[in-house]
């Protein structure tokens, strides 16, 4: 890592604007909530299954106490990455427009670019089958895809729920769906049949969560466009992920020492500053965030790939 020789003056007004920008389509925070740490590199503990071992705890009269020797701790190394994006404005553009409005718009572009990048990183990590063991993933074949009315998505989800319970002794409380996966699931005859029995209306994410006995169902609606803006692509594709997310504590803050499916370790939240170049004729608004997205508990997830035909 190079020397951080130049300190940046943060613009408080634009930083507050950046904090206020949030896209309802982004779901990375649900899977990989932000946990702030002080250093850009370090290690976080990987929790073992020692507490699941069945141990003889009976003790005879005057016998020695039973002893449990803790397993050696395993750690996950991390090194954060800096993400930054600047948007330029020529002084002539500034003269022809409302300065604050242009700066606010440029702040949106810069912060949105970083947020979309984080969403893509999260999707690639969560929906990559290589990140899961054999018991914690399935790729649906032709007859099992949710776009096939004869398939049984409820059974697939039930198997995933049981796989997680066997792995971590907790049932999953969340389901993340790509946008097209949600459409297929919400229109599936078996789901609509459950809806009819319950005498409910349209199958919303909230009703779907109730039917599947989950705390929440989240939909990844974010898209990206090609450089020529000719092609739109779903960030989250056509996959689904059952997972256990540890609820945040009373303060809402997260700690990497708490077991969880995943975390985003961050040194600081997004900040915005301004700098000039080209002899003072171009003013840049720049957004900066330092973080690393980590899948720390793959056993707490169950990936269902290729849900749609």
Where are the predicted features?
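Phosphate/anion-contacting hairpin/loop surfaces
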Residues: 174, 249-252, 265-269, 286-288
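Extended oligomerization regions of viral-like shell subunits
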Residues: 170-261
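Generic recognition of long tandem-repeat/solenoid scaffolds
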Residues: 44-47, 69, 242-244, 285-287
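Alpha-helical scaffold segments that mediate packing/assembly in large oligomeric complexes
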Residues: 91-171, 179-192, 308-309
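Protruding loop/beta-arch "assembly-hinge" segments enriched in small, turn-prone residues
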Residues: 1-37, 268-309
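Intrinsically disordered, low-complexity linear regions
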Residues: 2-25, 46, 133-134, 138-141, ...
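Assembly/oligomerization interface modules of large self-assembling protein complexes
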Residues: 20-85
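Short, hydrophobic/proline-enriched secondary-structure or compact coil segments at domain edges
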Residues: 14-23, 27, 31-32, 44, ...
